[in-house]
Amino acid sequence: MSSPILALGRSSFGDPANKDNLPTLEAAHALLNEWVPNERLRLHMKQVGAVMKAWALEREGADERTALKWELAGLLHDADWEKHPESHCRVIIEYLESLNVDPEVIHCIASHGPKYFGVEPENIMDKMIYVFDELSGFIHASALIRPTRYEGMDVKGIMKKLKTPSFAAQVSRDDITDAVGRIEYPLEEIIQFIIDHQKEVQ
């Protein structure tokens, strides 16, 4: 098997002593505005952050502080993609480590593409960012070609598009299958959750 394309070369991130050390949402959004000129990419990260937070609160019974971890991981997972595609993930990880950010947040970001970064999702937060990353973008692409956008969107339509290789061809169906196979929820349920929770994100 070939090495991951953007292999990070390690599986441990941050310092355990920094557990629960989190940036504010305001600081995270400021970082996005500075690092990510592309408005569509910023929207993608905001959508993943919102869906991550909603899942933590509604499905995992997380408290607000834990939900913030989930949201921050989603919000920042692609922060270095636009300016540093050849070092994607490495730059944002090293930056967050320099700020002494909670290692759970950093590991979650590092594990959002195991095939690319060589870091396996370890816990439910890691697994859900892997699930939500590709599916969130795919569902938003589907919304953009609909006159009513998210209104009236249903799971059946998304499932049909997933079986159409020419639609949003850059989205890896193999990654989606792998990601969903790591959790105990069916794909259809995840799709409905994303539709319900990211449609209001601007």
Could you tell me what each predicted segment is?
Residues 2-84:
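Acidic/His-rich, divalent-metal-binding segments that scaffold phosphate/diphosphate chemistry
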Residues 23, 43-47, 87, 123, ...:
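Conserved active-site and cofactor/substrate-binding residues in soluble primary-metabolism enzymes
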